[in-house]
């Protein structure tokens, strides 16, 4: 299954909801709503090559394609910050050495915690790719636009835990892809804000009605 390359965007969709991921990738469906559109607007500000710039001792690069051949994952990093550091790494033909930070932009910060764990896993996947390309130990940062706050992620302290989780997700994604199966519905709080709700939940209701009807017949 390692021959199946998986995009980081696919990992993100699978984390949000495996069934929704299956509708997008197996059934090839896509529906946008307010939350999707808002996310696209926020990303459009950073996914623009003209937004790359230099500020004092920091070079900022946006929309950077990254990949990891061994793990078979790839994607685009919102923003890479290169800060001059004596303990950093060399980057291409740039003079000096740099500390590398990955910054992922998100629209809303969770109310009851510092960061969304699914967001952190997405950034960790970007880190794996970035570290492989630049041969570094990059820092992961989430920027939540609603509170205008940067959150540094605990990758150094929990590296093995995140690595194990990523490998587990890749195995599941590749298994469903090979079988051509859409994962079953798992109803959660995310359903109310999902753009696929009208496509997904009616199917569940119909299945329940059919099941109830069969039960009535069997009882008779």
Identify the function of each model-found stretch:
Residues 4-11, 116-118, 182-189:
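Structural motif
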Residues 1-102, 111, 210, 214-220:
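Metal-dependent nuclease catalytic cores that hydrolyze phosphodiester bonds in DNA/RNA
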Residues 14-16, 105, 143-144, 196:
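Aromatic side chains
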Residues 58-170:
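Mg2+/Mn2+-dependent nuclease catalytic core
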Residues 129-220:
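Metal-dependent nuclease catalytic regions and adjoining charged, substrate-binding loops involved
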